[in-house]
Curated annotation (Swiss-Prot):
Top-level division of the source organism's lineage: Eukaryota
Classification of source organism: Eukaryota, Viridiplantae, Streptophyta, Embryophyta, Tracheophyta
Bias (Basic and acidic residues): 72-88, 97-169, 313-359, 368-387, 414-426
Keyword Coiled coil among record annotations: yes
Location of region: Disordered: 71-169, 210-237, 310-433
The name this protein goes by in its record: Late embryogenesis abundant protein At3g53040
Organism: Arabidopsis thaliana (Mouse-ear cress)
Amino acid sequence: MASGQREAERSAKAERAEAAASLAAEDLKDINKGDVTYKLTERTTTTEPERPGLIGSVMKAVQGTKDAVIGKSHDTAESTREGADIASEKAAGMRDTTGEVRDSTAQKTKETADYTADKAREAKDKTADKTKETADYAAEKAREAKDRTADKTKETAEYTAEKAREAKDKTADKLGEYKDYTAEKAKEAKDTTAEKLGEYKDYTVDKAKEAKDKTAEKAKETAEYTSDKARETKDKTAEKVGEYKDYTAEKAKETADKAREAKDKTAEKVGEYRDYTAEKATETKDAGVSKIGELKDSAVDTAKRAMGFLSGKTEETKQKAVETKDTAKEKMDEAGEEARRKMEEMRLEGKKLDEDASRKTQQSTESAADKAHETKDSVAQRGEEGKGSIMGALGNMTGAIKSKLTGATTPSDEETRASAHGDESTGKTVVAVDVKDTRPGYVATVLKEADQMTGQTFNDVGEIDDEEKVRIVVGEKKL
């Protein structure tokens, strides 16, 4: 505790000494600059009360400085030594504290300088009145103060330089120690770092080895898993392919069954249409036989009734009868040919249906049914057309024979001239049949041949007595 107080007192004394030295230095600086002027005047004997003037104030300040610097040299020296010891002790680890003290000292010096400047300005104002009396004294005192201040400044400078050298040496020693300490620490850090790097290197190698082993193990597991999955996928794919194969075979079988069913249905439909066509042809044939039978009966009856009428005809009538016979034969031949052509067309139509059915067995049942239906309509229509053509030709022939055999009119010259060929102006066809030059039973034979050509037959009525030429005029029916 006591040592701490002594150190505090020493520090305070050192600060006071530095402040006093700074103040004296500032005063000396002002004097050297010549800011203070002196004026010599005559000295009078007037006694005035003594009072301190500018010089007195300066001298008082200098005296205080002298007492502080010289009069208390022992204390100052002791304080200085103590301060030096303290500075030496603190130089190693308290460089920052020294900087703070230096800053504080500079601040104090500045404050003292400001205060001295203020006082100097005040003294300057008062000096104007006191210059005459105190000029010589002031000059002398100034010289003395200058000399003393110079000595003190020199001593202070030497002391400061010495202390600076000592501080420099101590600082160098400390810096050397710090340098050695830093080098040692750097070496230790380097060794520690190398050791740590070795440990890290070994650790990294171990970790890399472990990672490599784990990677190899994972790769092996992944390969095994991939292989298992590939086998499973292959098995599933094979199973699916088998299922799809079975499904495709089943669908192909179903398609073939449906095609066979469609083919059977189409064949059945074609058979039905063929039966229908044959039935229609049979009906047409029966109708033709019936019509020809009727025509035969009508012609025989008419011929018998007209025998008396025909027996009295002239040679012209016989010639016309011959022409009528030839024309009737041609008409019968044409009718038979037309009947054969229609039958051939129906046969070719049935054959075409068979070929169409063979080509379209792969089509759907609905399309086959539609086509069969259309074919049925076409066959029916063609059967009706054939039936109408045959019946129309036979009807026209029957009507012409009936109309002419039952009539009693005598042909005119115009009709006679047109007997060899049709009369275009009247729209009638003249047929001349030569009965005289024809053997007995010729008409019946012609009709029988016509029936045989069309696949029909009828009973022969025998020969017709007194056959002569018959002129038959077939007239076209006008609409």
